[in-house]
Amino acid sequence: MDLEDIRDLAKTNQLNQLSQLIDKYIIPQELEKKTNAEVSTPYKLRQEMLDKIPTDFWTKPHTVFEPCSGKGGFVIDIIDRFMTGLTDSYPDEKQRYKIIVDQCLYFSDINPTNIFICQLLIDPYNEYKLNYNEGDTLKLDITTKWDIAGFDAIIGNPPYNEDPTNTNDPHMKPVYQNWIYKFSKISIILLFITPSKWFTSQDILLYKLRDYMKNCKIEFIIHYANDNVFKNVTIKGGVSYFLINKKFGGETTFNNIQIDLKKYDIILEPKYYKFISIIYKYFEINLSKLYCSQGTFLNSKTEKELNNNTNDILCYVSKNKGLKKYLEKNKINKDYNYWKIITPAAAYKGSSGFSNLYILNNYEIHSRSYVSFKVNNLEEAESLLSYMTCKLTHILLSIRKQTHNLCNSDVFKWIPLVPLDRKWNNIILHKYFNLNDEHIDFINTIKLDGKYI
């Protein structure tokens, strides 16, 4: 696709075709992905999102802002919706287009190249007075820039994580919450797609976002659990899009099923509401009570001092490193004189159960590749191991586990701590929780990764 192709499509208002060609030919470069967290929303997903806005919205010249315009996918789609919706009000095609790009559409991006691309797509002959901002959108003052107080709708796919070149933290902090805070305040409708980690994450930034969202008038949430919604980009925990509507007065729907956002501390998928209500009373004393973090015995320094001397303390490491290493006793600063169940700190993907489980005696420790659960003796260890291999236990973990990570005790808060005086299996566990055939059938229908029986 060259410049003349773009001009021809724009001139003849073949916007739908132009929108699809953006996905094919105008692709974010690796540096743009890394520095600006730029990820293009696929054409079909953009259409799906825009279809959720009532058709009559596009029949009036509302103001719509795309705050992270990228390569222009949403920008062109928004124009296309207005071109259809305003046909009766403005029969003349050229006049209609001018009203849309002069009065309805606003867009912004930090990348000058993206602004140039959007200008080229919208106005290849430089005929119109476009409303755009080149710079950090989070610092944009729309009153100063455009002499307006807010928008009828804000639509987009904001950056997800901070620029890695601006931090020494290997765990990049989320930033999309800042976009939600800013733009939900200055729009009647906010339609964003973001990672779904905010549903359950205990990261303080996302925990605060979850509390904020519970008090917003969210009309719907559509969640995709798969981590491959975006081409060549993996989003752990999946992605979701939501619509905040200040004029909405009903209950939120999650994947088209009504839910109560405030009922639990996390955002719970609808299919689990009835089931969780049955066993919620058992959650007060839970598996997090026994939890020991991945750094309980080793830190980055002592992990480098592991050796192959079998006379030292046995330390379980990852399979890639041979599963078993050893460490001098005087290198261990914390008490390890207890039995423990260990499991890899990274298990499969989001919404999965436990990976492999091992019993360690009171003379053995583990590396930072594992988390563990502290018990008093072999009998309790065997009991806990049997409990942790039951399918129900894996399901309860998966509900709060949005990514592969088990490094926060909060993901175990909905796994009741059962008596460790018996061997558990699925039948015994179902009876313990007084589950009926309907509940058991539900458990059997759940498909998830995990090492369970």
Residue ranges: model-predicted function:
Residues 123, 389, 445-448:
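Short amphipathic alpha-helical surface patches that mediate protein-protein
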Residues 49, 118, 384, 443-444:
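A structural signal for short hydrophobic/aromatic patches embedded in well-ordered alpha helices
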Residues 86, 205-206, 212, 235, ...:
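Charge-rich, low-complexity amphipathic helices
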Residues 1-222, 226-229, 238-243, 247-252:
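SAM-dependent methyltransferase catalytic region
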Residues 67-69, 292, 319, 447:
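Generic detector of intrinsically disordered, low-complexity, polar/charged segments
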Residues 36, 227-369, 373-442:
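C-terminal substrate-recognition regions of SAM-dependent nucleic acid methyltransferases
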Residues 438-453:
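Short, amphipathic C-terminal "tail helix"
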